[in-house]
Amino acid sequence: MAEIAPLRVQLIAKTEFSAPPDVEWSTDADGGAALVEFAGRACYQSWSKPNPRTATNATYVRHIIDVGHFSVLEHASVSFYITGLSRSCTHELIRHRHFSYSQLSQRYVPENDAEVVAPPGIEDDPELLALFTAATDASRAAYTELLNRLEAKLADQGTSTLRRKQARQAARAVLPNATETRIVVTGNYRAWRHFIAMRASEHADVEIRRLAIECLRRLVAVAPQVFSDFEITALADGTEVATSPLATEV
């Protein structure tokens, strides 16, 4: 029986910042948030912080976001390694074209023992979950049989690596959308804010909304000055959403 894969979002990379020594400026932040402020001040050469209302990094970045000067957010980035995500969810995720992706290849990686992701509404209902599991098990059994027969059919063609790829790329057609995938996603701060605004909404599919919320929690830990304006709240059904009073791109 297929195992249910839990969603996991792991931070694997983030921006570091080194201020040029010939610029007389200091900040109370580091990393990506400091880079955002530096880029913004570089536009106006406001190194002396003439406006006391934007003298700290947090107030400066908040002002940048509030007035919609989003381009300076593009200099800093974060990378996540995401597992426990369904193939159907990544079909939605990769529509965000400002992200960079590296995803598990079903041509190179056999899916005989792949885990699955149970959709919301099914995962907490024993009868529906049993039906779901039976369907995914049947798909995986068909995949395994197709794979074995295709490998036998192609036994005298090309190299062993080529034969495996050809067999897997054909057999994968019967795998369900619920098949777990694994993906590295890199995006700049502007792209992440857009993703959160779009996908942490109550109008988004619940699986990708969960992903957006988990990413947001880790983004707040990395750069609270840039992401803490988003507030996470629970809906009546127990799922979570995130909204911001500041300017966002949708």
Swiss-Prot record:
Its EC number is 2.1.1.148. Homotetramer. Catalyzes the reductive methylation of 2'-deoxyuridine-5'-monophosphate (dUMP) to 2'-deoxythymidine-5'-monophosphate (dTMP) while utilizing 5,10-methylenetetrahydrofolate (mTHF) as the methyl donor, and NADPH and FADH(2) as the reductant. It holds the Pfam family Thy1. Pathway: Pyrimidine metabolism; dTTP biosynthesis. Keywords: FAD, Flavoprotein, Methyltransferase, NADP, Nucleotide biosynthesis, Transferase. Residues 7-233 form the ThyX domain. The active site is at residue 199. Belongs to the thymidylate synthase ThyX family. The gene is thyX. This is Flavin-dependent thymidylate synthase. It catalyses: dUMP + (6R)-5,10-methylene-5,6,7,8-tetrahydrofolate + NADPH + H(+) = dTMP + (6S)-5,6,7,8-tetrahydrofolate + NADP(+). The lineage of its organism: Bacteria, Bacillati, Actinomycetota, Actinomycetes, Mycobacteriales. GO terms for molecular function: flavin adenine dinucleotide binding; NADPH binding; thymidylate synthase (FAD) activity; thymidylate synthase activity. One of its GO terms (biological process) is dTTP biosynthetic process.
